[in-house]
Swiss-Prot record:
A GO molecular-function descriptor: serine-type endopeptidase activity
Function: Represses a number of genes involved in the response to DNA damage (SOS response), including recA and lexA. In the presence of single-stranded DNA, RecA interacts with LexA causing an autocatalytic cleavage which disrupts the DNA-binding part of LexA, leading to derepression of the SOS regulon and eventually DNA repair.
Family according to the record: Belongs to the peptidase S24 family.
Annotated keywords: Autocatalytic cleavage, DNA damage, DNA repair, DNA replication, DNA-binding, Hydrolase, Repressor, SOS response, Transcription, Transcription regulation
Name under which the protein is recorded: LexA repressor
EC number(s) given by UniProt: 3.4.21.88
DNA-binding region(s), chain positions: 26-46
Amino acid sequence: MLTRKQLDLLRFIQSRMQECGVPPSFDEMKDALDLKSKSGIHRLITALEERGFLRRLPNRARAIEVIRIPESLTQAAPAPQTPAEPRRFTPSVVEGGKSKQPPAPASTRMIDESGRAISIPVMGRIAAGTPVSAIQNQSHAITLSPDFVAGGEHYALEVRGDSMVEAGILDGDLVVIRKQDTANTGDIIVALIDDEEATLKRLRRRGSSIALEAANPAYETRVLGPDRVRIQGRLVSLVRRY
């Protein structure tokens, strides 16, 4: 769920892009939302990126890709300091100071063929620490842009623990996992140990053994026989909520 400020900013960016063909500047966004500094805009844009609504394009000034908008936004009031109610939104990429760019090619997969985000089941919690009981049944679902996933079957798990912090995975994050039973050395995987315990670790191989490596020096690497470990999937994306 987005905060009011996040919704206001998304609505303002959408409206400005439709009216002018270019995204607003940070100063314009700051003034529109009546914020005292541009750092607040940076935080809002980062939060919208992490929730799959916006994406900033690297090495380009004022380049913002709008991936999706919540359904409620199409029915909401006009954006701050925007004179007319925005038309129904069509995703596009625009770059400040230039004319509107054409939609990204199909290979970019910003949205699926029906124009909706993809629903990913959340299958409980996963330990980024000491292993926990095997993966539970689906508890709820989240929606993501197809940009966050490639082909194949996916599911999400809520992280518990701090053993993967140096890989940028924090307690409370949602990890998106591509379901597969093989992985390459160095991949972060969901490992099922002895068909009882599930853990999120980096895969290493030591001879015929499997090493489950933490990204935190406080945790030891576990080395197990291949008959004790089953790969349940590979990390492909991460969602952080605030």
